[in-house]
Design a protein with these regions (language model features):
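Short glycine-enriched loop/turn motifs at secondary-structure junctions
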Residues: 35-38, 160, 212
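N-terminal Rossmann-like or analogous alpha/beta NTP/dinucleotide-binding catalytic cores
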Residues: 1-83, 173-187, 227
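A generic structural motif
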Residues: 5-6, 159, 166, 279
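Active-site cores that bind ATP or allylic diphosphates and position pyrophosphate for catalysis
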Residues: 57-60, 64-194, 199-206, 214, ...
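Alpha-helix initiation and N-capping motif
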Residues: 15, 48, 52, 71-74, ...
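Catalytic adenosine-cofactor/nucleotide-binding cores of aminoacyl-tRNA synthetases and other
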Residues: 8, 173, 185-290
Length: 290
C-alpha cells in the first residue's frame, strides 16, 4: 500500500480513517504503512526526490518541459476556450520555449504527441483507443515539487513491481497519459482494468447527497464487517446469477476479473440491510456481544 497525498486537499484524520476501515473489513495489506516491506517508503511525501528526478530526466530528454504560465493566464485561457466553445486543455504555449536556469516558478508538463492514437487493452473493456489530439500536455510535477497522480502512479507502480492496476472507470480517460509516460521512461506497463462506478438509486455517481458514504459510519450504525465485505464485493461482480451470501474466504477464492461487469452498480441500502440481518441471525449470542 502506498499513500498518495494532495497537499491542498489533505483532511486531518483521513489516513487513520482509511486504514481503520480497511482493518475493520479485514482487508490486510502485505506491505505499506504500519507493516513495512521492501518497496518503501510508502508515503508520497517521503518519495518526492524520486518523482522530481524522473520528471527532470524527461525534461532533459525533451519528453517534458517547464511551463511558466501563471494561474491568471491559465484562467484567461480557459475562459477564452469556453467563449469559443472549444474543448478545455492547455494550449502548449511553453512547449517549445528554451529551459531557463533562472528560478522562475514553473510546473513540468509532459509532451504528449499531437498526432496519431494511443491504445491499450483493458481487462474489462477490451481494446480502448484515444485520439492523441484530445489529450493535452498535462502537468506531471507541480510548482511545489509534488507530483500529480499521473506521474506518481506510474513511478510508484513501476518501482513497486505492480502487475495489475484496478481502478474506477473515471480514470479510463487518463490511461493514455499513463501509457505514454511508461513509454517515455522505457517501463513495461501493468495490466489495466477499469471498474464500473458505484451509483446511487437515481443512477448518478454515489455521493454524500445519497446518504452515508463512509465505511466506518456503517460500522457505527451496527453493520457487520462480514456483511459489508460481502455486499461491496458484489457491486459490479458476481459468481453466478443467484449466489448472494459468500464468506470472505469464498469471495477471495472465487474472484476473477472476467466476471466484473461494465455497467455501473447500484448501491442498495435495502440489500445491505437484508444481508446484514442474515449474517446477524447466523451469529451466536456470544459473538454478537463482542
Amino acid at each position: 500500500m502506498c499513500i498518495r497525498q494532495d497537499v491542498s486537499r489533505t483532511v486531518e484524520g483521513a489516513l487513520e480513517s482509511i486504514l481503520g476501515a480497511l482493518e475493520w473489513l479485514a482487508l490486510d495489506w502485505d506491505e505499506g504503512p504500519r507493516v513495512g516491506g521492501n518497496y518503501g517508503p510508502y508515503v508520497q511525501s517521503e518519495r518526492l526526490h524520486l518523482y522530481q528526478d524522473i520528471a527532470e530526466k524527461l525534461v532533459a530528454e525533451d519528453k517534458a518541459y517547464y511551463c511558466y504560465c501563471t494561474s491568471e493566464r491559465l484562467k484567461l485561457m480557459r475562459e477564452d476556450q469556453t467563449q469559443r466553445k472549444q474543448p478545455p486543455g492547455y494550449d502548449r504555449t511553453c512547449r517549445d520555449l528554451p529551459t531557463t536556469e533562472e528560478q522562475i516558478p514553473h510546473v513540468i508538463r509532459f509532451k504528449f504527441p499531437v498526432d496519431g492514437e494511443t491504445s491499450f487493452n483493458d481487462l474489462i473493456r477490451g481494446e480502448v483507443k484515444f485520439s492523441n489530439h484530445t489529450v493535452d500536455d498535462f502537468v506531471m510535477l507541480k510548482s511545489d515539487g509534488y507530483p500529480t497522480y499521473h506521474l506518481a502512479n506510474v513511478v510508484d507502480d513501476h518501482l513497486m513491481d505492480i502487475t495489475h492496476v484496478l481502478r474506477a472507470e473515471e480514470w479510463l480517460s487518463s490511461t493514455p497519459k499513463h501509457v505514454k509516460i511508461y513509454d517515455a521512461l522505457g517501463y513495461d506497463p501493468p495490466l489495466f482494468a477499469h471498474l464500473p462506478l458505484i451509483l446511487g438509486p437515481d443512477r448518478s455517481k454515489l455521493s454524500k447527497r445519497h446518504g452515508e458514504v463512509s465505511v466506518l459510519q456503517y460500522r457505527d450504525m451496527g453493520y457487520l464487517p462480514e456483511a459489508m465485505f460481502n455486499f461491496l464485493a458484489l457491486l459490479g461482480w458476481a459468481l453466478d446469477d443467484h449466489t448472494e451470501l459468500m464468506s470472505i474466504s469464498e469471495l477471495i477464492e472465487n474472484f476473477s476479473i472476467e466476471r466484473i461487469g461494465k455497467a455501473g452498480a447500484i448501491f442498495s441500502l435495502e440489500k445491505l440491510t437484508w444481508m446484514n440481518g442474515t449474517y446477524i441471525r447466523q451469529m451466536t449470542s456470544s459473538d454478537l456481544s463482542k
